Amino acid sequence: MNKSKGTTTRYSTRLVLRIAVGIVFALATVVLVFSGNSVAQRDNDSAQRENGEAQRRTDFCSQTARALFESCKAEVTDGIFKKKAICINISDQKEREQCFDELDDAGEQGNLLCRQQRDERTNACQSLGEGRYDPHINPALFDDDFTNLTHPNPYFPLTIGNRWEYRGGNEVNIVEILNRTKLINGVRCIVAGDRVFKDGDLAEDTNDWFCQAKNGNVWYFGEEVKNLESFDGDNPRLPELVSIDGSFKFGREGDKGGLFFLISPRRGDIYLEEFSLTNAEDVTEILSTTYRFGSNTVLDQFVPQQLAKRFCSSGDCIVTKNFSLLEPGLFARKYYARGIGFFLEVKPDAGEVLQLTDCNFDPRCTNLPSP
């Protein structure tokens, strides 16, 4: 009996051990399976993160748009607090209350513009590409003697002494290639004086700095802008400097130049003219290289027929779309003629036209039609 009882006890013990071992093995298997799945999932998540990070590491244009969006919002906030400080110091209660009422609208409008600029920049990245904007400039590839250019651009002639006069609405615009140069990043640029008169008063006095590449491309390396305003009651009534907005120079505070006019443009080409973030961010897109009046109803819109026929009868005028990433939704179309250069700007949304009325270097400029 005692022996039988001991045998039974040992059998029961072995059975329990076998069951326990089986359970442990099963649990271990389950743990390993789940552990394996967890590792696989972690590997997959890690791979996805790496792919996402790799993509983010190369979407430099979009990164720029996002960074500038945050900068814009911060600037709006800064502006609101400055405006608040101004309101606090207004003694008249009615004026002070009105000032505070304007704060909310200013914030809403400012943040709306920030979002619109972000979207405009992001959309532009799809056309411009995601690469860093960092043009490599070799001074040896540029002319330094503007009296003897290697390959002059017929659509953007930079001959010293050339002068153009444009008119439209209440505006007169005079551009002249001056006998002056600027040395920027080792490249010699010609200075173009650009003066804008509104209602007879000088409103803008700008010096543009253009560089001529030996392959015929024209580059834009900066501008010195003086925005002016004249005030009734001043004696003498002289224009007063009110801002230098838009001024930039390649190599200063992160500013970079850009292409201004290609020697061999093709329809669909798109490029930055200037890269001065939050200050000057103009983009050019080539719409046509074979324009003549009557060939495209969209491009004919607001175009003075006589002017276009004077310069584009051969069907070789170039039309560009020009827009600023700082002014979402707005654009202009510019028209260029061989041997003349820029002769017409149309702003379709506003219906505004600025047209060439005179030049001093080509007989086709004689008796041009008036606006």
Residue ranges and their predicted role:
Residues 40-133:
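Soluble, non-transmembrane alpha-helical interaction regions
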Residues 113-371:
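Conserved functional acidic sites
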